From Swiss-Prot:
The chain crosses the membrane at residues 18-38. PSII is composed of 1 copy each of membrane proteins PsbA, PsbB, PsbC, PsbD, PsbE, PsbF, PsbH, PsbI, PsbJ, PsbK, PsbL, PsbM, PsbT, PsbX, PsbY, PsbZ, Psb30/Ycf12, peripheral proteins PsbO, CyanoQ (PsbQ), PsbU, PsbV and a large number of cofactors. It forms dimeric complexes. This is Photosystem II reaction center protein L. Keywords: Membrane, Photosynthesis, Photosystem II, Reaction center, Thylakoid, Transmembrane, Transmembrane helix. InterPro entries: PSII_PsbL, PSII_PsbL_sf. NCBIfam families: PRK00753.1. The lineage of its organism: Bacteria, Bacillati, Cyanobacteriota, Cyanophyceae, Synechococcales. Belongs to the PsbL family.
Amino acid sequence: MDRNPNPNNLPVELNRTSLYLGLLLVFVTGVLFSSYFFN
């Protein structure tokens, strides 16, 4: 991963937010699928 030398910190925060949203989406999908399979 190449890191940009610019001091702008906004893309890093956006990437972190999108990463957390992706993990949350995977977690919710896993819970829904597990409840669907165990019913």
